[in-house]
């Protein structure tokens, strides 16, 4: 009898522990908007090294285009954003487990991701562009025939360059691009005329040239590859949250605040037609 009571007591204790362990981590698959409104806070997961979308400055402060934009969105609802740096490879898992409430940091909307994630409207298209000095008089990609092109090793731009050779690879000198470990190195060579043009993400090109106050000295040409559509990712059940994000983005554009944030980071209006 004593043994039976002991077993029952132990089983009850284990059940309590199991409940405590799982209750705080996994958010139920429900529409959580009322909880966000009541708690006045929301957790957004981001990669804190993705310049210029969301990253940390030298003091450790979170800054970037997406940081500013998200803060403005939730300011409209009197909700404070808690920024949570995450392992970007595990972003969907963090969202599903309830460790974060949104993914917002240059997050590309794809058909594969749409199977498990509810996306907001696309607010920015990150294109692959060709950057050239205006003094080179190159205003379209056809003028890159036999010119020296640079690209970052392993970048999405260089991948597109190789997988779509008819667009650019067949035109440039040696039918290949000079490869660099970083965009900064490539941009230095571009500035010093060691290469004629550079294949690069538009968001990074605009940010870098804006920071250097050199936008006016360069031509930025669409490379002709398919761009990445950036959107905000939520759990499938959080339909009200996504609706509120979409509404706020449109309101921010009408008020001119979206353009203000865009010009701060890129020197131009990057909004998609979904937002305008």
Label each PLM-derived region with a short phrase.
Residues 17-19:
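C-terminal motif of bacterial Sec signal peptides marking the signal peptidase cleavage site
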Residues 21, 67-76, 142-148, 153-155, ...:
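Extended ligand-binding regions for polar small-molecule ligands
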Residues 26-106:
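Extracytoplasmic small-molecule ligand-binding "clamshell" domains
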Residues 48, 125-132, 202, 210-247, ...:
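Periplasmic-binding protein-like
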Residues 56, 70-79, 157-179, 209-214:
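Ligand-binding cleft/hinge of the Venus flytrap
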Residues 71, 80-143:
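Acidic, polar ligand-binding/catalytic clefts
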Residues 82-93, 176-188, 228:
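Short helix-initiation/N-cap motifs at beta->coil->alpha
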Residues 90, 107-115, 160-163, 188-192, ...:
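A ligand-binding cleft/hinge motif common to bilobed small-molecule-binding domains
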């Amino acid at each position: 009898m004593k043994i039976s009571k002991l077993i029952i007591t132990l089983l009850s204790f284990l059940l309590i522990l199991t409940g405590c362990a799982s209750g705080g981590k996994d958010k139920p698959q429900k529409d959580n908007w009322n909880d966000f409104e009541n708690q006045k806070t929301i957790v957004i997961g981001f990669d804190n090294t993705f310049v210029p979308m969301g990253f940390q400055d030298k003091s450790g402060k979170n800054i970037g285009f997406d940081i500013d934009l998200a803060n403005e969105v939730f300011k409209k609802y009197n909700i404070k954003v808690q920024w949570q740096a995450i392992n970007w490879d595990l972003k969907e898992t963090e969202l599903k487990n309830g460790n974060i409430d949104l993914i917002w940091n240059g997050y590309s909307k794809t058909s594969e991701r749409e199977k498990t994630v509810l996306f907001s409207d696309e607010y920015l298209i990150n294109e692959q562009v060709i950057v050239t000095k205006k003094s080179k008089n190159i205003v379209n990609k056809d003028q890159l025939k036999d010119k020296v092109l640079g690209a970052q090793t392993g970048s999405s731009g260089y991948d597109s360059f190789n997988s779509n050779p008819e667009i650019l690879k067949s035109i440039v000198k040696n039918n290949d691009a000079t490869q660099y470990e970083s965009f900064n190195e490539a941009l230095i060579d571009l500035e010093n005329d060691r290469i004629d043009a550079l294949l690069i993400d538009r968001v990074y090109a605009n940010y870098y040239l804006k920071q250097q106050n050199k936008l006016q000295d360069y031509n930025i040409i669409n490379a002709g590859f398919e761009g990445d559509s950036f959107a905000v990712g939520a759990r499938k059940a959080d339909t009200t949250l996504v609706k509120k994000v979409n509404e706020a983005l449109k309101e921010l554009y009408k008020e001119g605040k979206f353009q203000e944030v865009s010009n701060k980071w890129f020197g131009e209006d990057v909004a998609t037609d979904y937002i305008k």
